[in-house]
């Protein structure tokens, strides 16, 4: 029988695909069911964030960062706040640092719960998302009680945080931690030993460590390949150097290892939260939560009713904003998805001259072709799930 040359088959994966995480469009070239080439088409959620920030004062630019990785909003604000603080050369008081660390870890748990449980859903398990979202709901309420918003918080401001936390809220966060370990154990027992989940994730999307560095990976993507690289340990910011926690590291660099790391990171985050809660209710119970320089941080309402000086400061801050000394700075935080960096250039005015955002998901998505080659079509959604991509930060 004569051999016939079969043409490769091109299909669109997304943008309306349930496993495509928002607005991702992948053009897949398939040979039968084997993926030969992946071409990610991005930009469907591009809003021009970096350009818009140039027309806003340093304070007005904060809410834009919530809308990048909108699964864990405060972690993005954190990098921006650190960048502005470095240019201004100001310190954040200890209580403010602890509140920031506490809420950064809440963000990490929010992110990992979503990722782990929806990854399980992508490969066919329907119970984990229901359990995970129940816990996320409680954490969203903590967000809301701190700043009034469930998602777009604008709570971390240059100089500290917007307002202090009431003791009752900190106690409630403390009460949430122990039952959460039980929830994690239930999730662990349900997903980790599951035969189907293992078959869908073990040896899928393997990344060697040198490849991970070459592609510009960070966060869970390099830790899954065996590097104990975590900015909270390697370049500590805020008060992470005083916290006790471990960095989980994988061996095989596959989807399953990355899942296990995210599970363990949630436990470590809860550990850090416990330490923060104890300090905030103990030796750091009273104290300022933001810098006391009223040329940068607005004065309290009570002061404005008594002092003309405070009223003038407030008026200047919310009309013109503060001027940041000329210079440039790069500040990075260990966001849940990897290294989130803000490269800020100031020309001495009240608005950023340029603000470049380094989104971890962008670097991870570019390797989609490299990761998927030779895998089956069904593995594409498993690999995509383990990359942990949110389009707000990829398209910006």
UniProtKB/Swiss-Prot annotation:
Its EC number is 7.1.1.-. It is a peripheral membrane protein. PROSITE patterns: COMPLEX1_49K. InterPro entries: NADH_Q_OxRdtase_suD (IPR001135), NADH_UbQ_OxRdtase_49kDa_CS (IPR014029), NDH1_su_D/H (IPR022885), NiFe-Hase_large (IPR029014). GO terms for molecular function: NAD binding; NADH:ubiquinone reductase (non-electrogenic) activity; quinone binding. The keyword tRNA-binding does not apply. It is found in: Cell inner membrane. HAMAP family: NDH1_NuoD. NDH-1 is composed of 14 different subunits. Subunits NuoB, C, D, E, F, and G constitute the peripheral sector of the complex. Belongs to the complex I 49 kDa subunit family. NDH-1 shuttles electrons from NADH, via FMN and iron-sulfur (Fe-S) centers, to quinones in the respiratory chain. The immediate electron acceptor for the enzyme in this species is believed to be ubiquinone. Couples the redox reaction to proton translocation (for every two electrons transferred, four hydrogen ions are translocated across the cytoplasmic membrane), and thus conserves the redox energy in a proton gradient. This is NADH-quinone oxidoreductase subunit D. It comes from Brucella canis (strain ATCC 23365 / NCTC 10854 / RM-666). The lineage of its organism: Bacteria, Pseudomonadati, Pseudomonadota, Alphaproteobacteria, Hyphomicrobiales.
């Amino acid at each position: 029988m004569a051999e016939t040359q079969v043409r490769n088959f091109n299909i669109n994966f997304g943008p309306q695909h349930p496993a495509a995480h928002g607005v991702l469009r992948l053009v897949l070239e398939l040979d039968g069911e084997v993926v030969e080439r992946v071409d990610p088409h991005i930009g469907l959620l591009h809003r021009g964030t970096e350009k818009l920030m140039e027309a806003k004062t340093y304070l007005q630019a904060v809410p834009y960062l919530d809308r990048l990785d909108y699964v864990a909003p405060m972690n993005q604000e954190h990098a921006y706040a650190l960048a502005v603080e470095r240019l201004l050369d100001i310190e954040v008081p200890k209580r403010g640092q602890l509140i920031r660390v506490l809420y950064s870890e809440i963000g990490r748990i929010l992110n990992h719960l979503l990722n782990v449980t929806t990854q399980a859903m992508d490969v066919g398990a329907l119970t984990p998302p229901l359990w995970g979202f129940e816990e996320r709901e409680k954490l969203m309420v903590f967000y809301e009680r701190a700043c009034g918003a469930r998602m777009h918080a604008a709570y971390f401001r240059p100089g500290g945080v917007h307002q202090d936390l009431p003791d009752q809220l900190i106690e409630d966060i403390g009460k949430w931690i122990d039952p959460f370990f039980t929830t994690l154990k239930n999730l662990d027992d349900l997903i980790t030993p599951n035969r189907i989940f293992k078959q869908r994730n073990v040896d899928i999307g393997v990344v060697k460590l040198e490849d991970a560095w070459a592609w510009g990976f960070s966060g869970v993507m390099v830790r899954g390949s065996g590097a104990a690289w975590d900015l909270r340990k390697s370049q500590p910011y805020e008060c992470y150097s005083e916290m006790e926690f471990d960095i989980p590291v994988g061996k095989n660099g596959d989807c399953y290892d990355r899942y296990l790391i995210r599970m363990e990171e949630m436990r470590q985050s809860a550990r850090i939260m416990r330490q923060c809660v104890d300090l905030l209710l103990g030796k750091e119970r009273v104290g300022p939560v933001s810098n006391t320089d009223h040329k940068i941080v607005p004065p309290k309402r009570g002061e404005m009713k008594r002092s003309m000086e405070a009223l003038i400061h407030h008026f200047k801050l919310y009309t013109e904003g503060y001027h940041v000394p000329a210079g440039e700075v790069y500040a990075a935080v260990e966001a849940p998805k990897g290294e989130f960096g803000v490269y800020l250039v100031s020309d001495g005015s009240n608005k950023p001259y340029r603000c470049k955002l380094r989104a971890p998901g962008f670097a991870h998505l570019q390797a989609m072709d490299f990761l998927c080659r030779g895998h089956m079509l069904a593995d594409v959604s498993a690999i995509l799930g383990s990359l942990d991509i949110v389009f707000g930060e990829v398209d910006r």
